[in-house]
Amino acid sequence: MTQVATPDTVQANFDDVTISEVPGRAMHLERHGTEFWAEFDDPGWEGPSNDRPRIMRQVVMITGSHHQQIYWYATGHDRSLNILPGVFLLDDRRWVSRSAVLLHPPDQSVATFNGHWNAICVACHTTAPKTKFDTPFRSEAISQQAVDTTATEFGIACEACHGPGEEHVRANSNPVRRYLSHITGKEDGLMIQPALLDPQASSQVCGQCHSVWEFYELEDERIANSEGFPYRPGDELTDTRFVAQPMGAPDSATLRTFVEQDPDFVRGSFWSDGMVRVSGREYNGLIDSPCFRDATEPQETLSCFSCHTMHKSALDSRPIETWAKTHQVSSNRQGNEACLQCHKTMTPNLSQHTNHQVGSAGSACYNCHMPYTSYGLLKAIRSHTVSSPSVAESITTGRPNACNLCHLDKTLGWTGAALNSWYGQQPPTLNEDETLVAASLLWMLKGDAGVRAL
């Protein structure tokens, strides 16, 4: 996920290559022994664009390993980093403009990514980070701030999910203790095992990163800036941070305060009804799902571990690359088994419930109840709010519904009639276009950028 830039980790070709797929003049890449360098237009230049100087910077770090590589260069100011103007797509083996990958408003300066690593990305792309700005990020030009960002390890290391390991390492430095633990198969109790926590606590381990959240108070942020983020696996996540729930708790006074301070706090990441629409924030979707929110028994409560595993099982015969590309979904949770482990009564009458042939796309629980309505990493991603198809929601939010995401040639009127016939869902009033024109065409022509991408 995060690596030092070395010949073993950099996948793009830096051997005297010119990249034109960037804003302004082309970027030139060079290799100096084991070092990687880039020459490009100075993103911090504030004078006339025709006078923008060129700068040469060393690439020191990489984020991304499955879909793309983002290259970070040392700015020369303290420990602050910035991103090259291009991003390398791994499957396509090509460069694209950074603005095509890291979406931002068209009027936002390209220089605003300076320091993003130190203030934002470091929180989830490293283990035990400390942002260490002398004044709050964005409170003044980063060139005027002292930046001394540190992290214990790059990437998601053991302690990110299992908690501090010092006591565990000290205790198990004794070979006799290690041997006894091995033959008895007992945990030493000195590390957190997320899969053994209750569904809420185990999901919060993932939610520390996979959520839209904010500190409750500025003082909390100041402490985290200097001492590190206070949450540890096994803690109650909401004790130290506010996790946004515009769907499940739209009247939250804390949420209203953040929206007043930043109108994009919600609309930048959620559909208008509060459902998450961007990738990497699946915890917000999970906690608004009835399978999590309304469950009363732990064994029947949906959690991240209901479907995903962070360590590939020895019983999983798939190559590790295949497992990783399925978002680390367990081999026995890729199909309807994920839902039928709880909804057992559906098994003998599945086609009666779905009105589709067993084994077809329309008979897959995921496709109807977790459709591809989130966007990120240049692709559509399944919603992690378990819901049912609704034409009314498509009308009010603009969010594609599961039926029309499969039946691309059908109208919202057609879908409304089918849902009414099968499930008694009252169809909403539609205008002429919604009755006569395929919903997919309406979304492509009238939807916002996120909808068109889906």
Question: What does each model-found stretch correspond to?
Answer:
Residues 120-125, 157-160:
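Residues within well-ordered beta-strands of beta-sheet-rich folds
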Residues 1-64, 70, 83, 90-106, ...:
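Primarily the internal scaffold of c-type cytochrome electron-transfer domains
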Residues 89, 111-114:
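Flexible coil/turn and secondary-structure edge motifs
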